[in-house]
Amino acid sequence: MTVPERLSALRKCMEEKNIDVYVVPTADFHQSEYVGEHFKARKFITGFSGSAGTAVITKTEARLWTDGRYFIQAAAQLEGTTVELMKMGEPGVPEMNAYIEEVLKEGETLGFDGRVVSVGEGEDYAAIAGKKNAKVNYQVDLIDEIWEDRPVLSLSLIHISEPTRRVV
């Protein structure tokens, strides 16, 4: 599937689940800096492969927020996808939460996979929804419903290393 086809499938799923705005971060269950293949949902839905960024999908728009390290890469990878690049920190570019607050209407539902957002982010989203008398659905991984060949969760053993130096 192309990115526009994935977005179309996601929007259909959003409609079926009564989700009006859906947030797709770059994160895993442990808030790791670099995520395994299973957790590259934002890459799957936007086509952007950088290690940092968050997508916000509405019924009619798809936007990706990323920082200056990735402006050139993101612009190239988003070309032709209908995903709009939001260059964080640049003049005239709204902060992501301000955009969510703008597009989320009263009585609508903001959705995200609560397993991959921090408590702080979840609280921010709940506060935005509260201002709009909107609902929050944090128990929905819509990407999993449309990503047919999604890599399975890693079952590798965890290895605990000894500290490299000890402090007296």
PLM regions and their residue ranges:
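Short internal beta-strands
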Residues: 54-58, 62-67, 111-113, 138
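Compact, glycine/acidic-enriched structural inserts
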Residues: 68-102
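Structural motif
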Residues: 25-27, 66-68, 88-90, 112-117
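A general structural motif
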Residues: 19, 52, 59-61, 105-109, ...
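Short acidic-glycine loop/turn motifs at beta-strand connectors
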Residues: 57-61, 78, 130
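Single conserved hydrophobic/aromatic residue that forms the stacking wall/gate
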Residues: 159-168
